Amino acid sequence: SKDEGEKPFWISFADLMTALMTLFLVVMAVSLMVVTKKINEATQAEKERSSEILDICMSIKDDPTLKNQLITVDCKENRINFGEAGRFGHNDYRLNAEGIKALSALVPVVLEAANSENGKKWFKQIVIEGFTDTDGSYLYNLNLSLRRSEWVMCSLLDPTFNPELTLTDEQKNQIKQLFLAGGVSFNAAKDSKEASRRVELRMQFYGLKEKESAEAQPIFVSAPIEKCQLAR
């Protein structure tokens, strides 16, 4: 009939817009779900990372070997403090016998933690930080703090510094890769000058995707006998 012939064949513009809006909302909802899922996965991964790093630090802190030492392990800041044992005399970069003894007890514990399942996954390096008081110029204190850090490294690798610390060649190579000597001058002074003249160890850990893009660690060949270059 005439009426049937005049019925519109195409859908109305309003119906078309409604369909497009519905499709747009569906696409947006799916996209939002995907983004939310990725955020939740990243959040969960970061929680797991933080938990595993805490386990690494606590394994060092709770090790019975360190029970009678003056060492303080701060698992919130990931720092290791030697207290009185890690202090230096004025204008002196030589770690005292008590500090070397504490270091001897600590290093095998740290290496064991670094070689654990979580340690291999997250442990990046340990920065040996030497500090000074505020006496003298900046460059003077920078040099002094560097020598204090280097003295700690000498205590780990030069057998004449610390006969009590017996390490295998593999452990010595791991120390060269894991430990980093760095000076900090007087940027973090304590309440007293005596407390400021100290050495601390700062543990650093990989980020979630950092290790995947990290460059390969250099391979160090152990010398028959490592010899410290600092004057004793």
How would you describe each model-predicted region?
Residues 50, 57-58, 77-80, 101:
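Charged linear interaction tracts used for macromolecular binding and regulation
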Residues 68-81, 122-124:
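Short edge beta-strands and adjacent turn/loop segments
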Residues 93, 97, 127-210:
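Periplasmic OmpA-like peptidoglycan-binding domain that tethers envelope proteins to the cell wall
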Residues 213-232:
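Short, cationic low-complexity segments
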